[in-house]
């Protein structure tokens, strides 16, 4: 079973992402911020990381940069799931190493389609 790490400081977003992806057949682990996400990623192997941008302690860009320095996460797809839609933010995400970007609010079908595309 493919494993996904969902990192978001919003419990309702984590619940929606987890519910949607579990129903699509994925195993989902959840983290409350970038630091928590990094700790969980270092202790395990995920096939996809989905992260919010704006979070306390460590934001999504810092998390992506830290993950990309980990040998096991050099090529793992990382998806930004955020309310931010400005071109500058997307550019910063790409420079940090993000694979893709979904703007909130999002549909369950959209999230599943992107996950299937990113996880081979």
Positions of the model-derived regions?
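Charged docking surfaces used in two-component/phosphorelay signaling
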Residues: 15-23
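Short hydrophobic/Thr-rich beta-strand motif most characteristic of the beta2 strand and flanking loop
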Residues: 25-32, 40
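Active-site beta3 strand of CheY-like receiver
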Residues: 44-50
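Active-site residues of response regulator receiver
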Residues: 52, 82
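Receiver (REC) domain active-site loop signature in two-component systems and cognate sites
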Residues: 55
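C-terminal output helix
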Residues: 106-115
């Amino acid at each position: 079973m493919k494993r996904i790490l969902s990192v978001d400081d919003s419990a309702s977003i984590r619940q929606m992402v987890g519910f949607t992806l579990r129903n699509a057949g994925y195993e989902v682990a959840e983290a409350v911020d970038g630091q928590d996400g990094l700790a969980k990623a270092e202790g395990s192997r995920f096939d996809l990381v989905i992260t919010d941008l704006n979070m306390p302690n460590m934001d999504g860009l810092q998390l992506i940069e830290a993950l990309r320095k980990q040998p096991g996460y050099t090529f793992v797809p990382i998806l930004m799931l955020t309310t931010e839609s400005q071109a500058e933010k997307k550019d910063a995400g790409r420079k940090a190493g993000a694979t893709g970007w979904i703007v909130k609010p999002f549909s369950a079908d959209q999230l599943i389609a992107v996950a299937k595309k990113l996880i081979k």
